[in-house]
Amino acid sequence: MGSPEPLWKPSPARAERATITRYRRWLEQTRGLKLGSYEELWRWSVRDLEEFWLSIIEFFDVRFSREPEKVLGRREMPGAQWLPGARCSYAEHIFRDKSPDEIALRHASELREPGEWSWGQLREHTAAIAAGLRNLGVGEGDRVAAYLPNIPETVAAFLACASLGAIWSSAAPEFGARSVIDRFGQIEPKVLLAIDGYRYGGRDFDRRQVVREIADSVRSVQRLVTLGYLDGSGWEPGFLGSGDLEFSPLDFAHPLWVLYSSGTTGLPKPIVHGQGGILLEQLKKSHLHLDAQPGDRLFWFSTTGWMMWNFLVGVLLTEASIVLYDGNPGHPDLGTLWTLAQRTGMTCFGTSAAFISSCMKAGLEPASGGELPNLRAVGSTGSPLAREGFRWIYDQLGPDVWLFSTSGGTDVCTAFVGGVPTLPVREGELQGRALGCAVEAWDPEGRSVVGEVGELVISQPMPSMPIYFWGDEDGSRYRESYFSMYPGIWRHGDWIEITPRGTAIIYGRSDSTINRGGVRMGTSEIYRAVLDVPDVLDALVLDLPREGTGGWMPLFVVLRDGAKLDHGLVAAIKRRIREEASPRHVPDDVRQIAEVPRTLSGKVLEVPVKRILMGTAPEQAASRESLANPEALDYFVALAQERDFARD
């Protein structure tokens, strides 16, 4: 298969302005490194790992209250030791060299009109919350749990915790009580910050009873502090303190926050990231891969229950500002976020592949009137972006927009592969492997392959890998999660292909692979074909084993209003899969469903649904509290009772 023609190339002027160009020139001047291409730069960054991360420290002037003894102490994974002996402050770097009158963030929600906070305001709010927490006895190592939405007060609360050395953990207010208790209960927070309610899709949701249930159930909580968001009253009286913002010098590996896995098949894994590792990774990612420049305004739709919120806050390490939105991105229609882009002058619009697909299916024309003159980049993540999604962005937004699809994980709070502002964009491909990320595709024997689909592995340590899972005293849960297949090598659980030119293609989760007649295929290839059928809005495909046969592969589809799953549509779906994927991967059956089950972060629930249809008890296969639409499971539970798919 030949190389697809680029959909976009940076102009010479744009490539010259990119921070990564300045960085490469600096490497040549200070280290004599003449790296003529991005691929050469990437290879150097993973071959000379210590030298690369030392260059990031020097180029971005990372400051330490105590200097590190070396870049890497223990090198083996898991347990690589980064910058032993160093002390620094993540929060101090966020606020460093910021003009108090410049804008730090812009915000909007279904409850509030668009507004903005200057750096002076953000610092003032952060100082007041930090003083309030200190008055409650919060100090270094204490956990502060937040049941807060994506609003400026939440950013300030996180930075307040970081300044004190307290460990932050957040859950979005739409999470149910059981889901939040399953998360916060594991880390035993001292303080719970929570809202009274929120508005979503035009409806008000009072969460006071849920908050009380959480506070009563998480027995470590000594103090509940309420933020009146729904009623507009703000922080409860007496909470905010006074005084200047101070920054506690902390060990490089001091925990910054606890994130969580989806928890679809058990208690969510509490993933702990060190403040120094996140600092280095976010400096690299925001500057060199997002190309966040002074004056830029970056947005990524997220809730506080998804790592993209933490990722977006990291952009504040640059001289760009960020844009926050709290609410339903489809209310009152799919034009809401595009209108926000126009009103806030966004330069980068970050979203999910599913949102782009929805806009495309709805026939949306976000820039039909030329309302997005400042938009220079669009980012996509969450799942592989279909080729049609690439084409739709360029058809709608024009040839000058840089579209970067990116893939990573909560586990590392960053992307392994994705945007490179100086490389061309090709349909269906991610531009390159991230600097310092030794991404490879491995076959089952542990051999690196190019031009073939393999397991996505990371063969060298990264600073933002988890320092541990909370409560995993012997590290067994951590090792089992990433290192059980290839000892000492991080196996992420995705299928990936590295092309001969260094781009990447993600094919979906390797634990939900379709295997037909010995030919393996990622589910994303089938979804790309199916979602190209105009009447299909969403889909779920499974490969179910059967005794004595090659298995049974059903396809479940969500149709647009008014569409009917008749013989003609079934034939069209199968024909598209046969032509765009492979004749081997035409489904045995096509069925209509109302919704595809998804996690709270939007991921399709392939493996748990497969387990239900193979006879696993629903409560063991999936935690309903971890789902965005738990009622979508009911269809599959009923279906599993109709027949035994494993034997029929």
Predicted ranges, named:
Residues 115-120, 248-249, 256-280:
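Conserved AMP-binding A3 loop
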